[in-house]
Amino acid sequence: MKNFIFNHPLISDKLSKMRDVNTGYNFFKQLLTEITTLMMYEVGKGYELEEISVTTPLATTKAHKLKHNFVIVPILRAGLGMVDGVHNVIPTARVGHIGLYRDEKTFQPVEYYSKFPQTMDDGHVIVLDPMLATGASVIKAISLVKNIQPKKPRSIKFMGLLGAPEGLKALNQAHPDVDVYLACLDEKLNDKNYIYPGLGDAGDRIFGTK
């Protein structure tokens, strides 16, 4: 298990704009895409390469490419806002989807939709959700990824924008084998389980809804 909290001036600058209540949804989504792309530099470390032969205009030479398939799994709906940022770096990554809603009696996430590429059991998976609040939805989503195929993915990583210490701790305890990458770890959860100071409802701000 690895927790990586980014400390980068470009990410910090863009994140401050996302937090601003006056930032419109188009710019908000653009900033989320840009931060996701920047984060992929670190998320992509450690993936295996294989040697290939490439013909340049001058010669044939040895080169390297990513060895295994990649699948990104956004948690609906806010996770969709991070897909383009990953595709900017790994355009061949296939996309699975997980839809969850909260049971009003148990307050636990319940699956209402999931669909995954057949390459899940032969590649690396990155689960996407901008907000890691209580951690319940992310924990549920990762459990679904682990159980959907008889053969597990080679690796599973989680990538988010903001996290609360409570959610990070819960995720680490539930899935100690999953590396976690966050652009920022905020102060706490408030009494409504929103990340504080946060940036509001990420899904609403991405899609311009209320």
From Swiss-Prot:
Gene3D superfamilies: 3.40.50.2020. Uracil binds at I195, G200, D201, A202. It holds the Pfam family UPRTase. Its EC number is 2.4.2.9. It comes from the Bacteria. Its cofactor is Mg(2+). Transmembrane segments: none annotated. 5-phospho-alpha-D-ribose 1-diphosphate binds at R77, R102, D129, P130, M131, L132, A133, T134, G135, A136, S137, D201. GO terms for biological process: UMP salvage; uracil salvage. Keywords: Allosteric enzyme, Glycosyltransferase, GTP-binding, Magnesium, Nucleotide-binding, Transferase. One of its GO terms (molecular function) is magnesium ion binding. Pathway: Pyrimidine metabolism; UMP biosynthesis via salvage pathway; UMP from uracil: step 1/1. Belongs to the UPRTase family. Catalyzes the conversion of uracil and 5-phospho-alpha-D-ribose 1-diphosphate (PRPP) to UMP and diphosphate. This is Uracil phosphoribosyltransferase. It comes from Mycoplasmoides gallisepticum (strain R(low / passage 15 / clone 2)). The gene is upp.
